[in-house]
Amino acid sequence: MQNYTLSQIAELLSAELQGDGALEITKIATLAHARSGHIAFLANKKYRSQLEVTQASAVIVSEADAPYFNGNKLIVANPYVSYAKLAQLMDTTPRSAATGIHPSAVVHPNATVSKSAAIGANTVIESNAIINDNVQIGPNSFIGEGVKIGSGTKLWSNVTIYHNVEIGSDCLLQANSVIGSDGFGYANERGQWIKIPQLGSVIIGDKVEIGASTTIDRGALDDTIIHSNVIIDNQCQIAHNVEVNSGTAIAGCTVLAGSVTIGKNCQIGGMTAINGHMSVCDGVIITGMSMVTKSITEPGIYSSGIPHTTNKEWRKSIAHLRNLSEMKSRIKALEQLNKP
């Protein structure tokens, strides 16, 4: 990894430099674990006390927090965004999921693969698939018949893309993600389940990121649609005919049931479950482990669930919860007695 001087980093971040611009930075670290040569950042004031004890050679801070640190510092408007940009510069992740076309890859003669694309070992690309410029497909992946993958998209290892799925440009799919598998569609006839073929597909826009082991089901008739600039964390389940609009972020282990529509620029916390056929308007934040059983029509922050407590207190609360109906009746009766 290349090292950078504090002056170079300040220029990259458009930051105000206070301190030794010639200082060489070798790594980004947290305030708690930083050592000499490291740069840290303060993005949450609850960690402000760590500024007094950190061993970091430099710290990225806001103007409000700058007086609390006497060492080398870069003053910026948004330390977390600046950290993100610096992390991109100093990223040690391998740049390529694959290089060239591996001899063990199996590419159908009718598939179209750009000369600049890279296909990893043991990957299979089926008939009529279109792999555009600078696409990287990691080893042991499967690209089904008629799939289209836009330029600059990267698939890490063991990714499965079912038939006729379309993925836009500059997307990132982490390992073991599955796109276009059958939606959960069945009809019941006298106790027997009859499978409903899922005739739609999955359409993914540009600059979408999909986490490891996340599954996105194909539509029953219409397509499942993930619009551009959506980010989805690991181990999420996106059911058939869901539509997620641009700029939305979905955290890990979230489940969107069939035909859910999520608006633009929403944030959905981890392990949230949204019931089928619900819609969520633009600009909604849903906190983790919420259960959404009705559509949300107004922007804002929404929560549900019972926060943790001791088992003893939880048992007491649940006992009261079971008696709510009886308690309501008793309160109403008391109110009637106290009426003039």
UniProtKB/Swiss-Prot annotation:
Pathway: Bacterial outer membrane biogenesis; LPS lipid A biosynthesis. It catalyses: a UDP-3-O-[(3R)-3-hydroxyacyl]-alpha-D-glucosamine + a (3R)-hydroxyacyl-[ACP] = a UDP-2-N,3-O-bis[(3R)-3-hydroxyacyl]-alpha-D-glucosamine + holo-[ACP] + H(+). GO terms for molecular function: N-acyltransferase activity. Its EC number is 2.3.1.191. Keywords: Acyltransferase, Lipid A biosynthesis, Lipid biosynthesis, Lipid metabolism, Repeat, Transferase. Signal peptide: none annotated. InterPro entries: Hexapep, LpxD, Trimer_LpxA-like_sf, UDP_GlcNAc_AcTrfase_non-rep. The keyword Repeat applies. CDD domains: LbH_LpxD. GO terms for cellular component: membrane. The active site is at residue 240. One of its GO terms (biological process) is lipid A biosynthetic process. Catalyzes the N-acylation of UDP-3-O-acylglucosamine using 3-hydroxyacyl-ACP as the acyl donor. Is involved in the biosynthesis of lipid A, a phosphorylated glycolipid that anchors the lipopolysaccharide to the outer membrane of the cell. HAMAP family: LpxD. Belongs to the transferase hexapeptide repeat family. LpxD subfamily. Homotrimer. This is UDP-3-O-acylglucosamine N-acyltransferase. It comes from Pseudoalteromonas translucida (strain TAC 125). The lineage of its organism: Bacteria, Pseudomonadati, Pseudomonadota, Gammaproteobacteria, Alteromonadales. The gene is lpxD.
